[in-house]
């Protein structure tokens, strides 16, 4: 998580939760001259388009006042979807036993990309069973993690 993403998370978590939703996480993606702020929300009853629109309006109001982003960007609000991104230790705990794809910032055993089953979480370390062996990854070293849906 970048410094800007951390700042945005701290700024937006309370307004999103006040609207009755969980702020699962967010990503700020820079792509040339165009950037995107993608916010993932969830609710115990699921998420629909109206929920996304409601949160988008709430978040836009906060961003307009605080103005933390200095470049032009698009705002996207969505559910986490089938390939749910995992941002926090609690997300890994929630999905113990599920398959995950992980991309690391710094390689472990000469690999940055891993796939396996979430085995457990201990503080800021997640354990994943990869090809029968348990591998430990510091949450701070995980660049991106997504559930792999079963069909």
UniProtKB/Swiss-Prot annotation:
GO cellular component: cytosol
Gene Ontology terms: biological process: ribosomal small subunit assembly; translation
Keyword Cytoplasm: yes
Keyword Cytoplasm (UniProt): yes
One Pfam family recorded for the sequence: RimP_N
InterPro entries, sorted: Ribosome_maturation_RimP, RimP_C, RimP_C_sf, RimP_N, RimP_N_sf
Main location per the UniProt record: cytoplasm
Coiled-coil regions, chain positions: none
UniProt keywords, alphabetically: Cytoplasm, Ribosome biogenesis
Compartments where located: Cytoplasm
Signal peptide start and end residues: none
NCBIfam families: PRK00092.1-1 (NF000927)
Family: Belongs to the RimP family.
HAMAP family according to UniProt: RimP
Function, in words: Required for maturation of 30S ribosomal subunits.
Name of the protein in its database record: Ribosome maturation factor RimP
Organism per entry: Vibrio parahaemolyticus serotype O3:K6 (strain RIMD 2210633)
Lineage: Bacteria, Pseudomonadati, Pseudomonadota, Gammaproteobacteria, Vibrionales
Gene that encodes the chain: rimP
